[in-house]
Swiss-Prot record:
Residues 1269-1398 are annotated as: N-terminal hotdog fold. Residues 1428-1577 are annotated as: C-terminal hotdog fold. The modification O-(pantetheine 4'-phosphoryl)serine is found at residues 1650, 1767. Residues 919-1164 form the Malonyl-CoA:ACP transacylase (MAT) domain. Residues 1693-1720 are annotated as: Disordered. Non-reducing polyketide synthase; part of the gene cluster that mediates the biosynthesis of meroterpenoids called sartorypyrones. The biosynthesis of sartorypyrones begins with the production of triacetic acid lactone (TAL) by the NR-PKS spyA using one molecule of acetyl-CoA and two molecules of malonyl-CoA. As spyA lacks a thioesterase (TE) domain, TAL is likely generated through self-release from spyA by spontaneous lactonization. This is Non-reducing polyketide synthase spyA. Residues 1269-1577 form the PKS/mFAS DH domain. The lineage of its organism: Eukaryota, Fungi, Dikarya, Ascomycota, Pezizomycotina. Keywords: Multifunctional enzyme, Phosphopantetheine, Phosphoprotein, Transferase. Multidomain protein; including a starter unit:ACP transacylase (SAT) that selects the starter unit; a ketosynthase (KS) that catalyzes repeated decarboxylative condensation to elongate the polyketide backbone; a malonyl-CoA:ACP transacylase (MAT) that selects and transfers the extender unit malonyl-CoA; a product template (PT) domain that controls the immediate cyclization regioselectivity of the reactive polyketide backbone; and 2 acyl-carrier protein (ACP) domains that serve as the tether of the growing and completed polyketide via its phosphopantetheinyl arm. Disruption phenotype: Impairs the production of sartorypyrones.
Length: 1834
């Protein structure tokens, strides 16, 4: 049996930052009474430091906070966080502490019967030859122990060692502050392979100033110190010479001769302070070596001096030191066992070359806890089996949108009662009923109850608008609760989740029902959809229930959820409640029943002044899971529900009267389920509403059950803070208690001053309501949450603190960067989150590792947009978040992930190496390697661990193959555990064994059996000729021919790797012969044998027997085997020998995968293999779209490679977890309460009553018009053979329209300038004119512009523009607005556009004459006239104030000179005026300033009276000769005026470019009418109220209705028009921006679900007046095919209309055209018929708009059924038709396809029988009438 006593004790160098688990273990050991002296020495370090600073004040520059934290950590249970800067003042003494604790723990473990003295003495005896050795800081520990005979000596020497370590660490930190402030020194290990490597390394180092060798570690390793800025270049230079550089986490200069002065300072301090010198003894008791020379220390007189030199100034020759030590061990008498070295410390420093060659064993005492840190401490309370853990929570209450804000509100005793938010409820006399007493509408209202992120939940704006805000808020708060539970972390999401939501009423139903029904009205207001929507969004399959028990609804929901989890109905559940007030009815009803406070004050639970409750709004949810499952899943547990109960009051009194005995029974039942006594409950969250009847009853119940002889029980109610949230009140109380448990505090009770007189004193029964914040001092915190419903239901929930898990073990991941993944559904949400996270970082002291872990695990990887980055430090992270431009650049749509294929390479050499940091850094990887190691040991084979980290060649084939497989398996299994969604695995040669194992064909144990057994057969039964393998670049046929080209030798093709990449195999001689004769490029492979050839035949029979001994299963993950002709259909024992014997058809396998799956994400399983290179080779040039990932876990920074690879896969949309953020690593992190998802919200709110109709229209218009241009095409009503007539919409909410309208105020109101009518018409003409009439470089000509009615601010009106084509690029136009029952024409005219041709614009002949007559000389004449009047800018606009006031940014007139009836002005626009979001055609702001010159001239006339003003009523012609786009001037304007009667002036204005003196604009015949200011005031007021009375239809000759209904054939322009209209319809219904909609967009991707499809079908039929609906779910439409379907129906309808028109013409009844037939109508009758038809249709359309609440235009071809006509609506509509037209009709008895036009024809036909409006000839022929009305009415 091997000895457990060491031959040598080695103390390692300065520690790297220990894991929290390690620190926790050391901390626990320091509490051992046996180590109290060591703990005391640590405790005294801060005091020693103070003394040291007094002696050497320069040390005051060093931050001593870490030293104080070290003391606190050693004394109590605080966590020791290692600062990012890795201060040596902390790490140096911590290194000594770790060494000593490890040593003493090891000594204690030797023999429990030995005394402490005996244990140390036995070790001194066993180390008499090897002694105690230490490197750098470890020398202090070694010296302390080597010079100690007794336990007392150890304590004395330990104190010296700790203090010296502190001194050295402090001086190294001081050196950093002084010399390394900007570029710190860091340490690194350099390793090389060959014997001449050191010379090359030394040569490289000479090229780097200041770099020095600090330690000779091994025969091929050294430690070097260099500045951080030098590391990158140094690594590259060393790599070029075959050397590897690995950084170690030590900052500062040790072993540097530059510290000579520091050494003298320290020696001086030591000479004056005995506590810094080791006690004088003749020599160390056991051998102790100078680690500078390796020689033995023979005198201990100045041991402190030697120690300081070894650490500070002298380089360490550790290799020589340990060589001498090992040599001394080898000189011992021959023993039957290998020497044991006890290695202490967190860093191993044993030279591997020495221990391997001398067969020395090494042992390191554990630095981690032996018990699982996630094992609950249940010593004080035995949680019942049915206990339910709360693993996530979220809330939204008044004044608190997060859990932290909720806690801050509660602990501050805040109250959130206030007035009803503006715009929430339509408080008009019709909608607000008068209760017995007028009650104020006050409460605890959410400020943004109508805001909702519809995009996140895939809902359209239209659907969101009709959704009860309770549904919307519940969705968002539920999302936060789910997010906080880390449900979104990578991996398969558990869908067996229940949803239980408490909801009282649905106030919003009243609002929705005041509007016309839509497809979304029912689903938006039915309460069942509150829970249903949540379950549907997350795809949950568990029960989904909406529960209403009045005020106890949410508590009942929680109670039911707990029951269902216990019964196995679901594994997890979301439970809570919501309450939103959107209608006054419930408020008035509650007030009438005297529930509410008549004063509108806050809730005052149990207070003497309580007079009723105050309503509140809010929502809260908790995520629930069985406690045992939560512990197993390593969930963060916020609290535990150990019992809940529900009952109902008896029926002896009124239903709303609470019953004390029912409540008492309830508490006792809940306590019984919790297995608790009343005294175990130390807080009660009471229902406590502040009602005079309910509070005393509840207090009596609490007293009866929980009062008496016991510690004080506190109780209170959260309703004082946020009001009575009714259906959400139970969850509010539970969340408050959970926050109390987390913070271990009892908050003050708000609004409590004096106990209700109906409640007896509390103190006798040890009850208390506190008004101060208290510490919750209970040894075990448990509370009872009460929740009662007005209908009699009572519920109580017992909730207690979670199991006290041991503190997190901390992490030892020293990463160069921590990866972050942040996702959002929209770019705005993503940016909002980054801002919130950045702000949160300013107020947290959490380490970067914990933040990265918490943020990344909460992200929902299914969202559309994401950013990824790696942060090196908190400062780096803040910079990344703060760089908004970089975020814009990095934020990108989450790509659709490609299929993932795991690739396993074959053997390519005899070296298998894994960097130790990868093994130690990832418990996920380590667990799988350890599993393989365990299985191999159980098989009697050598373990893996000792060989993994060695880069030496491995001759043992069994070990080689087992190592190779194990690393491949461990990497692949780690990826699978991290959630990598693998869709195919493929293995090359030996890699196929890994593929079989990962796919599930064989178990791990069986696979290792095959791998090891096969390797043993190779080792034992392979013939003497091993063979060799040759890679060759040639095509397949060439490879086969080469294999046959060596006579007398058999050469085979072993691997078909690519189109021109093959591997040949044969004997050594055969391959040599081939190499000599071929001209192809070849390369020998470093394989151990010639596989896949006849050389394997010797052992195939034995291999077959081995293959038959294992079990084969059907693969879980599809596997592509490298076989010819196709993948294996099944796996049998016969396949394995075939696999070893036959060639590897890797190229074929990759080609099959590529063909089947398309572009893939290829991930290599394994370390140092060439799988990805092989895949690229096989794909050849066909790599487009593929991505490739290979971990470099054999590099010097393996975890950095893991970080980079993970981020790359995140960027490709792959849902995979970073290995170090996996659940297995959770014990090494502390969870942080990072910001929750930031919603990208839009406000949606339907008001009820008439007020709602106006606000509805405006808000809907704003939302609908968000993406619309200023002028946009609505429809094209051109007919075949007739002029085109087009309808355009004018977007009043466009920013440009707002600028045009609000740039000036006319008598305090806004009024549209004449120039804006020109711009609107020009934009419309440019849209329909195509390239011929583009907006760039155009000539605009306007003729006969007439202003019929001014246009002001009309929020409820729809402004439109109509065009009729009357020539090439020439259009008649009219600007019209519609509001209520009025249709108003504002302006008409004719406009034409011409484009520049050859750089010139076409100018009519009259303008050529005008330019000659009106030259620049006229301007100069006016300016030179001494009698002329000159006005400056200020005076000019002062004159204009009589009519209008202009904003400074819109003022262009700088000066003006007036001479008689002529004027000259100089103009220049301010630069700020150029803020147009669209390209303008005529620039209305500039054009308005030009027109002002004539107006000012008129106002300056001698005959202009004080009350006179002039308004422009039109103009004859306007022509532009040069585009004004982007022009600011300067311009010169000449105006000439001519009186035309006593009240009218005609003005001609000419605009010249001041620089070129060229005429650029002419305005002829501008008419100015003289009116009084009071008249203008009336006009302006009416314009802004839209109250003018005008005819229902105002049309000029320019835009008359077409004279025929013949339609033009469809063309591409029609299709594009359909696409444009359809895009806007889709945007309105789904919320998808039109810019993201193209013809190829599938409707499913545009979020068109069944409800949206119904709405879209209706809207399509309305907009395109189709005769039959299009069923969107019968075919899989995309937008393009839908456009084609619409066009097809339109073509069919147009063809029918054309045939009808032809037939009508044949009977001489053509509308608008005279015939010779005697049956034709006379001119006046025909005109009256047309006018009457238009009037009836207009009035009918407005009536239908009101009946069906439709804001869009209703076309004649629209079927009434598509508008939503049902039997109830029909009754109302029939009444309206009778009132308006005298028409009595049963609408439901008519054809279901009745259209609006058809109904208008019925009205006309009915009126024709009783009026004389239509000619008698027409009355005699009903068919003719119907024909004409059909043509006009569609």
């Amino acid at each position: 049996m091997a000895s457990t006593l060491p031959s040598t004790v080695v103390c390692g160098s300065q520690t790297s930052p220990p894991s929290r688990d390690c620190l926790q273990r050391i901390q626990a050991d320091l509490k051992d009474p046996k180590l109290k002296e060591l703990a005391k020495a640590v405790d005294e370090l801060p005091e020693f430091w103070s003394h040291l600073v007094e002696v050497k004040p320069v040390l005051s520059q060093v931050n001593d906070a870490p030293l104080k934290k070290l003391k606190d950590w050693a004394k109590d249970e605080s966590v020791l966080n290692i600062p990012e800067g890795l201060p040596n003042i902390l790490l140096a003494p911590l290194t000594v502490i770790i060494h000593l604790v490890q040593y003493l723990r090891f000594a204690h473990s030797l023999d429990a019967n030995d005394s402490q003295e005996d244990q140390h003495h036995r070790i001194l005896q066993s180390t008499s030859k090897g002694g105690f050795q230490g490197l750098c800081t470890g020398f202090l520990s070694a010296a302390a122990l080597a010079c100690s005979r007794t336990r007392s000596d150890i304590w004395c020497n330990a104190t010296v060692a700790l203090r010296l370590a502190t001194c050295v660490g402090a001086y190294v930190d001081l050196d950093r502050l002084t010399y390394d402030n900007t570029d710190v020194h860091t340490c690194m290990i350099i390793h090389w392979e060959d014997n001449c490597g050191k010379d090359q390394v030394t040569e490289v180092l000479k090229g780097y100033p200041g770099v020095y060798i600090s330690v000779e570690l091994d025969n091929r390793s050294i430690t070097v110190t260099a500045k951080q800025s030098q590391v990158s270049l140094l690594r590259g230079d060393l790599a070029a010479r075959g050397a590897k550089l690995t950084r170690i986490p030590i900052y500062g200069r040790y072993h540097s001769r530059t510290h000579a002065e520091i050494l003298q300072d320290l020696l001086e301090i030591c000479s004056n302070d005995e506590s810094l010198r080791f006690p004088i003894i003749s020599a160390p008791i056991v051998p102790l070596r100078n680690n500078t020379t390796g020689g033995l220390i023979t005198s201990a007189e100045k041991l402190h001096e030697l120690a300081l030199k070894c650490m500070l100034t002298e380089p360490a020759d550790w290799y020589s030191t340990m060589s001498e030590t090992v040599s001394s061990l080898m000189l011992q008498p021959v023993i039957n066992e290998h020497p044991l070295i006890l290695e202490l410390g967190h860093v191993s420093c044993l030279p591997r070359s020495l221990t391997a060659s001398a067969n020395i064993r090494a042992f390191t005492p554990l630095l981690t806890l032996t018990a699982s840190p996630n094992e609950p401490d249940a010593s004080r309370y035995d949680y019942p089996e049915h206990s339910i853990a709360v693993i996530g929570a979220a809330c939204k209450f008044t004044g608190a949108e997060t859990m932290q804000q909720f806690w801050e509100l509660i602990r501050a005793g805040g109250t959130m009662v206030g007035e009803l938010p503006e715009g929430r409820i339509a408080l008009d006399k019709k909608s607000l009923r008068k209760p017995p007493r007028e009650e104020p509408l006050r409460g605890n209202f959410l400020s943004r109850a109508g805001h909702f992120d519809h995009g996140l939940f895939g809902l359209s704006q239209r659907e969101a608008r009709y959704m009860d805000p309770q549904q919307r808020i519940a969705l968002q708060v539920a999302y936060h609760a789910v997010e906080s539970s880390e449900y979104f972390r990578s991996g398969i999401k558990d869908k067996n989740v229940g949803c239980y939501v408490g909801v009282g009423g649905s106030d919003y139903d009243h609002n929705v029902c005041s509007h016309a029904p839509t497809a979304f009205s029912f689903t938006g207001t039915a309460r069942a959809f509150v829970s249903g929507r949540i379950s549907h969004h997350f795809g949950w399959t568990g029960p989904s229930m909406t529960i209403d028990t009045a005020c106890s609804s949410s508590a009942v929901a929680i109670h039911q959820a707990c029951k269902d989890i216990r019964m196995g109905e679901c594994r997890m559940a979301l439970a809570g409640g919501v309450n939103i007030i959107s209608c006054p009815n419930m408020q008035q009803n509650l007030a009438a029943a005297r529930f509410l406070s008549p004063t509108g004050g806050p809730c005052r639970p149990f207070d003497a002044f309580a007079d009723g409750y105050c309503r509140g709004e809010g929502c809260g949810f908790v995520m629930l899971k069985k406690l045992s499952c939560a512990v197993a899943d390593k969930d963060e547990i916020l609290g535990v529900i150990v019992g809940s109960a529900a009952n109902h009051c008896d029926g002896n009194d009124a239903i709303t009267v609470p019953k004390s005995h029912s409540q008492i029974d309830l508490y006792r039942k809940a306590l019984s389920l919790a297995a608790m006594q009343p005294k175990d409950i130390t807080y009660v969250e009471a229902h406590g509403t502040g009602t005079s009847r309910g509070d005393p009853v509840e207090c009596r119940s609490i007293r009866q059950v929980f009062g008496g002889e016991r510690p004080t029980l506190h109780f209170g109610s959260v309703k004082a803070n946020v009001g009575h949230t009714e259906a959400a009140s139970g969850i509010a109380g539970l969340l408050k208690v959970l926050l109390m448990i987390r913070n271990q505090r009892i908050p003050p009770q708000a609004n409590f001053t004096q106990l209700n007189s109906s409640i007896p004193p509390l103190e006798p029964d040890n009850l208390s309501i506190t008004t101060n914040e208290l510490e919750w001092k209970a040894t075990f915190r448990a509370a009872c949450v009460n929740n009662y419903g007005a209908a009699g239901n009572n519920t109580a929930v017992i909730v207690c603190e979670p199991p006290r898990l041991k503190p997190s073990a901390g992490n030892n991941h020293i990463l160069s960067g921590y990866p972050f993944l942040i996702t959002g559904q929209s770019g705005r949400s993503l940016k909002m989150y980054c801002t919130a996270l950045g702000e949160w970082l300013e107020n947290t002291d959490a380490p970067l590792s914990d933040i990265a872990f918490s943020v990344t695990r909460r992200q929902n990887r299914t969202l559309r947009r994401r950013i990824t980055f790696a942060a090196r430090s908190l400062k780096d992270m803040k910079n990344i978040l703060g760089q908004q431009a970089r975020l814009d650049q990095q934020s990108s749509p989450s790509p659709k992930p490609k299929p993932v294929v795991l690739v396993f390479a074959g053997q390519t050499g005899n070296v298998v190496y894994l960097h130790k940091d990868a093994y130690e850094g990832s418990s996920l990887l380590r667990s799988h390697i350890d599993e393989c190691d365990k299985i191999l040991r159980e098989m009697g084979l050598r373990g893996l661990i000792a060989f993994l980290f060695d880069q030496q060649p491995i001759e043992d084939v069994v070990l080689l193959h087992c190592l190779f497989f194990s690393l491949q398996y461990a990497c692949a299994a780690a990826w699978l555990d991290a959630g990598l969604p693998v869709q195919r695995v493929i293995g090359h040669s030996i890699g196929q064994f890994t593929a079989m194992c990962i796919s599930g064909v064989t178990t791990l144990a069986d696979t290792l059996k095959i791998v090891a057994g096969r390797a043993r057969l190779i080792q034992q039964k392979w013939a003497k000729e091993r063979g060799c393998m040759l890679a060759i670049e040639v095509d397949r046929q060439g490879a086969l021919e080469l294999a046959r080209s060596v006579p007398g030798h058999k050469i085979e093709v072993a691997c078909f790797n690519g189109a021109r990449n093959h591997v040949l195999v044969g004997t050594e001689v055969a391959i040599q012969t081939l190499e000599a004769k071929t001209s192809c490029k070849t390369r020998r492979l470093k394989t151990t044998h010639g596989f896949h050839s006849e050389l394997v035949d010797h052992w195939l029979d034995d291999y077959m027997a081995l293959a038959q001994s294992i079990t084969y299963a059907t693969p879980i993950i599809p596997i592509e085997t490298c076989s010819e002709g196709g993948s294996w259909k099944e796996f049998t024992p016969e396949m394995l020998p075939r696999h070893s014997r036959e060639a590897v058809y890797f190229f074929d396998a990759i080609s099959r995968v590529d063909k089947e799956l398309g572009p893939c994400t290829w991930v290599e399983g394994g370390v140092g293999s060439k799988g990805i290179a092989l895949v690229k080779c096989a794909l050849g040039t066909n790599t487009s779209g593929h991505s490739f990932h290979r971990l470099q876990l054999d590099s010097s920074e393996p975890l950095a490679s893991l970080t980079d690879t993970t981020i790359q896969m995140w960027d490709e949309g792959v849902d995979v977890q970073f290995w170090l953020y996996h659940d297995t690593e959770k014990i090494t992190f502390d969870s942080c309460d990072v910001p929750a998802y930031q919603f990208d919200e839009t406000e949606f709110w339907l008001l009820r009553s008439d007020q709602a109709r106006q606000s509805d229209l405006q808000r809907g218009r704003v939302i609908s018009d968000r993406y619309k241009p200023l002028v946009y095409l609505l429809r094209d009503e051109g007919f075949r053979g007739e002029p085109r007539k087009l309808h355009f919409g004018v977007n009043q909410y466009h920013p440009d329209f707002d600028r045009y309208l609000h740039g000036r105020e006319v008598l305090g109101e806004v009024l549209c300038p004449v120039s804006v009518f020109v711009e609107l018409a020009a934009k419309a003409a440019a849209i329909c004119g195509g390239r011929e009439c583009s907006t760039a470089a155009t000539q605009v000509q306007v003729l006969n512009l007439e202003i019929h009615n001014p246009l002001g601010h009309a929020p409820g009106a729809r402004v439109g523009l109509r065009l009729k084509r009357i020539g090439s690029c020439k259009w008649g136009f009219s600007v019209i607005s519609d509001k209520d029952v009025q249709s108003i024409c504002h302006a008409t005219g004719v406009i034409s556009l011409r484009q520049e041709r050859h750089g010139k614009l076409e100018i009519g002949p009259q303008w050529s004459v005008i330019q000659r007559v009106i030259g620049y000389s006229h301007i100069q004449d006016v300016l030179d006239d001494s009698s002329a009047i000159s006005l400056k800018e200020g005076i000019i606009y002062k004159v204009l104030e009589k009519v209008a006031e202009y904003k400074p940014c819109h003022r262009a007139i700088k000066s003006m000179t007036i001479k008689g009836t002529a004027a000259v002005a100089q103009l220049e626009m301010p630069a700020i005026s150029r803020d147009s979001s669209e390209i303008t055609v005529s620039d209305p702001l500039v054009m308005d300033q030009f027109a002002l010159i004539a107006e000012v001239l008129a106002l300056c006339r001698d005959d202009c009276k004080r009350d006179d003003v002039f308004i422009c009523s039109g103009l004859s012609e306007l022509v532009t000769f040069k585009s004004l786009q982007s022009g600011l001037g300067p311009w010169t304007v000449y105006t000439q005026q001519t009186p035309c009667g006593p009240r009218e002036l005609l003005s001609d204005t000419f605009v010249f470019d001041s620089t070129s003196k060229q005429l650029i604009i002419g305005l002829l015949g501008a008419r100015f009418v003289r009116i009084t200011a009071s008249s203008l005031n009336g006009i302006v007021k009416r314009a802004n109220l839209n109250s003018q009375t005008s005819e229902l239809s105002v049309e000029t000759d320019a835009v008359n209705h077409p004279a025929s209904v013949a339609y033009p054939p469809s063309n591409n322009n029609d299709t594009s028009d359909i696409l444009s209209i359809l895009s806007h319809l889709l945007h309105e219904i789904t919320g998808l921006p039109p810019s993201e909609i193209s013809a190829s967009t599938p409707l499913m991707e545009a979020s068109v679900d069944s409800l949206a499809a119904t709405e879209l079908e209706n809207r399509i039929q309305e907009e395109f007046h189709l005769h039959r609906p299009i069923s969107l779910y019968e075919r899989q439409f995309n937008v393009g095919t839908l456009c084609q379907e619409i066009q097809t129906q339109r073509d069919d309808r147009l063809a029918r209309a054309s045939r009808t028109t032809t037939a009508t013409r044949n009977t001489s009844f053509s509308l608008g055209r005279r015939t010779s037939s005697t049956e034709s109508l006379p001119d006046d009758a025909e005109a009256r018929f047309i006018s009457k038809s238009a009037a009836v249709l207009a009035q009918l359309s407005r009536m239908l708009s009101e009946s069906f609440n439709i804001t869009e235009s209703i076309l004649p071809g629209t079927e009434l059924r598509s508008l939503g006509l049902d039997s109830l609506v029909a009754v109302e509509l029939e009444y309206d038709l009778q009132q308006a037209f005298g028409l009595k009709v049963d609408l439901m008895q008519l054809s279901p396809e009745l259209t609006v036009g058809g109904l208008a024809r019925l009205i006309l036909a009915s009126e024709s029988q009783t009026s004389g409006h239509i000619a008698s000839s027409m009355m005699d022929c009903r068919q003719t009438t119907e024909g004409k009305s059909q043509m006009y009415l569609g």
